[in-house]
């Protein structure tokens, strides 16, 4: 069964936006608050490119792009990239960094629901990384992503599982013990179980293709993609053909 979900009010948590606005100027500091994003980006990019059959020449939308770490890297692969975010400061940082780097990315400040209403079935690839756990209605985001992708196109989601281990690793460990991200970055109540995400996907034209975990080893201080979705995970889906 295919269903569409449309938000009446903007699907925005202003407190979440404020968190990222406050540290936006340090988005491209490789040793700053966003160091983990810089470190996992090659893994994310590699997974997206491989599962999409390459990004060169493809039209790509990065939902919740922030300061543009993933968006820029996909543009470097030869994609035509649009970055979407509701934070004015992160977008300003993203635009400036792209200009300094000589990389063309079109950054737009609007919700994914608003963008889907204007640009249905316009993208070969849609990415939504570490964003679902920061909005009031993540289901609405999933539905909007499904509307944005072309038939046969690829949609990627990444988020955090909701369980005791995820709370221990992503909140206690990352925020308080190892101080990898600022305190208060995550709210365990907003974490999303894979079954919940897959349930929302099943309500759309998207079909699950692959799911994989993103794992951090504190002993070696390294990240890797591997089976096991008990903390961070990525989901690859494709849009059904007409």
UniProtKB/Swiss-Prot annotation:
Entry EC no(s): 2.1.1.222, 2.1.1.64
Keywords carried by this UniProt record: Methyltransferase, S-adenosyl-L-methionine, Transferase, Ubiquinone biosynthesis
Highest taxon in the source lineage: Bacteria
UniProt binding sites for S-adenosyl-L-methionine: 44, 64, 85, 129
Gene Ontology annotations of biological process type: methylation
EC category: transferase
Record's keyword annotation contains Ribonucleoprotein: no
Pathway entry: Cofactor biosynthesis; ubiquinone biosynthesis
GO molecular function (one): 2-polyprenyl-6-hydroxyphenol methylase activity
Substrates-to-products reaction catalysed: a 3-demethylubiquinol + S-adenosyl-L-methionine = a ubiquinol + S-adenosyl-L-homocysteine + H(+); a 3-(all-trans-polyprenyl)benzene-1,2-diol + S-adenosyl-L-methionine = a 2-methoxy-6-(all-trans-polyprenyl)phenol + S-adenosyl-L-homocysteine + H(+)
Protein family per UniProt: Belongs to the methyltransferase superfamily. UbiG/COQ3 family.
Function: O-methyltransferase that catalyzes the 2 O-methylation steps in the ubiquinone biosynthetic pathway.
Protein name (Swiss-Prot/TrEMBL): Ubiquinone biosynthesis O-methyltransferase
Organism: Klebsiella pneumoniae subsp. pneumoniae (strain ATCC 700721 / MGH 78578)
């Amino acid at each position: 069964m295919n269903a569409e979900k449309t938000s009446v009010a903007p699907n925005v948590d202003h407190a979440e936006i404020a968190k990222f606005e406050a540290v936006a100027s340090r988005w491209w500091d490789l040793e700053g608050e966003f160091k983990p994003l810089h470190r996992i980006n090659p893994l994310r990019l590699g997974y997206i490119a491989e599962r999409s059959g390459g990004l060169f020449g493809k039209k790509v939308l990065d939902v919740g792009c922030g300061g543009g770490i993933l968006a820029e890297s996909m543009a470097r692969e030869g994609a035509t990239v649009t970055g979407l975010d509701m934070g004015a400061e992160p977008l300003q940082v993203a635009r400036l960094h792209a200009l300094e780097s000589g990389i063309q990315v079109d950054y737009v400040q609007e919700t994914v629901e608003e963008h889907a209403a204007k640009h249905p079935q316009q993208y070969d690839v849609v990415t939504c990384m570490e964003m679902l756990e920061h909005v009031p209605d993540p289901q609405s985001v999933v539905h909007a992503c499904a509307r944005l992708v072309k038939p046969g196109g690829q949609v990627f989601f990444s988020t955090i599982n909701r369980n005791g281990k995820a709370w221990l690793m992503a909140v206690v460990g990352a925020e308080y013990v190892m101080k990898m991200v600022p305190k208060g970055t995550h709210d365990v109540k907003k974490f999303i179980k894979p079954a919940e995400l897959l349930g929302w996907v099943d309500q759309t034209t998207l079909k699950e293709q692959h799911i994989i975990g993103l794992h951090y080893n504190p002993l070696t201080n390294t990240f890797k993609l591997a089976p096991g979705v008990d903390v961070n995970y990525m989901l690859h889906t494709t849009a059904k053909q007409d």
